[in-house]
């Protein structure tokens, strides 16, 4: 789950040394939104499932703005924007624009626009990929001094096409690509919008990774899967979870969505085939019960205290040695640092590449 005030810039930061320009879009050659070549590249990233971006702006914007100001990310990836795409009833949708077709939607668009024009967000260019209704959707905020060369909104890298429900934003920089996804939930049953949808998604992700191996990748977002037992607070609870007593016929599909053996196995195979590194687990080998999970259940009810790590930064092996830090910024079962969402922000910081390393990454 989105520009014109003077930005707040940290002393000695790249943005402070070089003025940030507006992200002027220009039509490319039919394969995405292409931007001017920029020799500086982002190195600080943040991903967050906002669980309704509008609600976060209305209720939690001050604390989230402070978090962004303090960390000063170059790129912010948002999932579960939950704002509808522009286009009236029965008309083609513009999935890159917020809808203003009704009085309520116009007011909501104005709220988001004002929020994203205020410090520190006025320093970022914003790209949206929105669903037809207030469901799912993603956003990508990139500092204006780090303009991507191209931006796509699908796994097939086709101009103007958006994934159903706005689940993908792919930004191409000079030496790497950044993929922001809101991966579909597995659901509880072998139905078209549950198990089948997730299997198809996982298959397409592998195909995407195989087609784009010419350049290192940073894949972030809500990937809706916990890879290992260490990635959940209560493995037995999640492994035996049921919906209204229903048990899938295949034991590989049993358990909490995001923690079934089938999903976990496919996720592990995807990481291996894509030659990816889980940045957080690369640095944090042991389970951290206070701050090692990105999603937390409702503090009231059976999911109280039940937590999962389902938000990730996966990076190509070529980038492994540049990982400086990868942190989850929520703590405890009371959702401290979650900024109103049921997910907390996750951040990644890379060291600056040497000239030789940059050349090798592009050539490999």
UniProtKB/Swiss-Prot annotation:
**Could you say which EC number(s) this protein's record lists?**
3.1.-.-
> Which residues does the UniProt site feature Interaction with DNA substrate point to?
343
An example molecular function term from Gene Ontology annotations: metal ion binding
Cofactor comment: Probably binds two magnesium ions per subunit.
- Per UniProt, the ranges with Basic and acidic residues bias are 1-12, 23-39
Q: Which GO terms describe its biological process?
A: DNA repair
Cell compartments where the protein resides: Nucleus; Nucleus, Nucleolus
Tissue specificity remark: Expressed in leaves, flower buds and developing siliques. Not detected in roots.
Null-mutant phenotype, please?
No visible phenotype. Ape1l ape2 double mutants are embryo lethal. Ape1l arp double mutants have no visible phenotype. Zdp ape1l double mutants are embryo lethal and cause DNA hypermethylation and down-regulation of imprinted genes in the endosperm.
Cofactor(s) the record lists: Mg(2+)
Carries keyword Magnesium?
yes
Annotated segments matching region Disordered: 1-42
Record site: Transition state stabilizer:
224
InterPro entries noted in UniProt: AP_endonuc_1, Endo/exonu/phosph_ase_sf, Endo/exonuclease/phosphatase
Please name the CDD domains in this protein's record.
Ape1-like_AP-endo
In which residues is Mg(2+) 1 bound? 80, 342
Task: Tell me what the record says results from residue 224 to D.
Answer: Loss of 3'-phosphatase activity and strongly reduced AP endonuclease activity
The annotated active site, in chain numbering, is: 182, 222 (proton donor/acceptor)
Keyword annotations for this protein, in alphabetical order, are: DNA damage, DNA repair, Hydrolase, Magnesium, Metal-binding, Nucleus
Which residues hold Mg(2+) 2?
Answer: 222, 224
Q: Name one GO cellular component term.
A: nucleolus
Q: What class of enzyme is it?
A: hydrolase
Q: How does it assemble?
A: Interacts with ROS1. ROS1 is required for APE1L to stably associate with the DNA substrate.
Member of which family?
Belongs to the DNA repair enzymes AP/exoA family.
| Biological function | Apurinic/apyrimidinic (AP) endonuclease involved in active DNA demethylation and gene imprinting. According to a report, also displays an in vitro 3'-phosphatase activity. According to another report, has no in vitro 3'-phosphatase activity. Catalyzes the conversion of the 3'-blocking groups 3'-phosphor-alpha,beta-unsaturated aldehyde (3'-PUA) generated by ROS1 to 3'-OH. Has a strong non-specific affinity to DNA. Redundant with APE2 and at least one functional allele is required for seed viability.
Question: Under what name is this protein listed?
Answer: DNA-(apurinic or apyrimidinic site) endonuclease
Origin organism is Arabidopsis thaliana
Q: What is the lineage of its organism?
A: Eukaryota, Viridiplantae, Streptophyta, Embryophyta, Tracheophyta
